[in-house]
Amino acid sequence: MPSPDGRLSHDLLPGEKGPRDACGVFGVWAPGEEVAKLTYFGLYALQHRGQESAGIAVGNGSQIVVCKDMGLVAQVFDEATLNSLRGHIAVGHCRYSTSGSSVWENAQPTFKSTSTGSIALAHNGNLVNAGELAAAVARLRGAAPAAPSISNPASSDTDLVTELLAGQPDRSMEAAALDVLPTLAGAFSFVFMDEETLYAARDPQGFRPLVLGRLERGWVVASETAALDIVGASLVREVEPGEFLAIDEHGLRTRRFAEARPAGCIFEYVYLARPDTTISGRSVHAARKEMGRTLAREAPVTADLVIPTPESGTPAAIGFAEESGTPYGQGLVKNSYVGRTFIQPSQTIRQLGIRLKLNPLRGVIEGKRLVVV
């Protein structure tokens, strides 16, 4: 494994910290396709979900290679790098941290080797029983101190899951997953792989979105339907809460590891998801527009102009204007070269980002009573 200055990684590093809550995950199983490039474009479509780091793991049936680094997807990967990642299966990740350092060591996918193979895992979510999982890893390490799958101590929720899945080399990955998944508490949408098979799982509440798509010669799993659109995959369905998927040369297999208790995060509709994404059969754009209409009915005001805070606020502002009969207009100019300010890792950076990102059209708004959505 090279130093953090390099890009290729074949193991976890000590000291990896921090849950990942609003990240983007993407996986593809497609023999004969350029899976690294499909994953690159899928992550590009999910870039809004995380801008700190990006990574892709590719398997060719005999080994897994992981490439990850700090930065945006287009900064981490170039044509030469993508051309070097050959295989029939891939998983990718773009990271936003809810806590912990924004450093190379925390980039995903995570990776672990075992005596029978390897696993690469990408996680969108935040587990709340990390202490229990750490104890399980410690017991596993104590029971098999020489096992090749147990090397560095795990220090984040994602690392712990990777350790637990990789720590049972005498069992199949499917069997290990169906044993581990019911022990997890919190939010998780996983996309992971061994050398031959693509796996996906979603927590029983379905906190974070996860969808299944079909290519002409394969399958895709992604955080949002917009990523399926970009790579030319057709939507099959959502991965159900409490469902586990396995995809290989024998096709698609599904198992339920927990009873579904749907409780999706409303912030996906409000901010996190792309407006051209569909969640639970409903357009995010339409949902935001209806939120604006509802706001106008429940909190009516007299105003001269309705303006959005671009981009997430635009559909809601349009809905408010249409419902209230108040004129709609642009009052804030967005700098398209500044990333999403809410998901920056510190409050100081967020405040600087807002000043860089938005500037008022003074001639439009000066002296007017405004509704800012």
Spans of model-derived segments:
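Conserved short alpha-helical segments that host acidic/polar catalytic motifs at enzyme active sites
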Residues: 1-241, 246-303, 309
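Extended, hydrophobic alpha-helical segments in both membrane/secreted and soluble proteins
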Residues: 306, 313-320, 324, 328, ...
